[in-house]
Regions:
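Short peripheral tails and domain-boundary helices/loops at the edges of structured domains
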Residues: 109-124
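Short aromatic-glycine-enriched beta-strand elements
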Residues: 38-49
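Disulfide-stabilized netrin-like
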Residues: 56-79
């Protein structure tokens, strides 16, 4: 009987510890890299998921190409965005609420939506 209680305790501790070490990911959205502009001036649109409308531009027109995008935002986290993603690529992301890293980004201009969101690309 003591062995059973001991083994049950070990099992419960193992399960509890596993839950404590799991990273909690926020809501995951599907996005598309619409414009891969110069110097990380990237425009992304939300194509799946119910994102807070106050975080994105309902409709935004690129003044260079005159193309209009819906649910668009500018990349707010250029330091950790994968260089392997190209314009037109779809990917999953969550809003990154951690402290943003500082990195060198050139100052060349390319138009982006006024609203910026720091995101983290996630594998789904």
């Amino acid at each position: 009987m003591k062995l059973f209680i001991f083994l049950a305790s070990i099992f419960l501790l193992t399960i509890s510890a596993e839950n404590c070490t799991k990273k909690k990911t926020g809501t995951v959205y599907k996005g598309r890299l619409e414009v891969k502009g110069l110097c990380m001036n990237y425009t992304i649109s939300v194509i799946e998921g119910n994102i807070d409308p106050s975080l994105v531009e309902a409709s935004w027109t690129d003044e260079t190409t005159k193309k209009t995008y819906t649910n668009a935002f500018g990349l707010g986290s250029p330091c950790n965005f994968p260089a392997t993603l190209n314009a037109g690529d779809e990917f999953y992301f969550s809003i990154d609420t951690t402290k943003q890293e500082n990195c060198a980004v050139c100052m060349a201009y390319y138009p982006t939506p006024g609203k910026k969101i720091p995101i983290k690309v996630v594998v789904k």
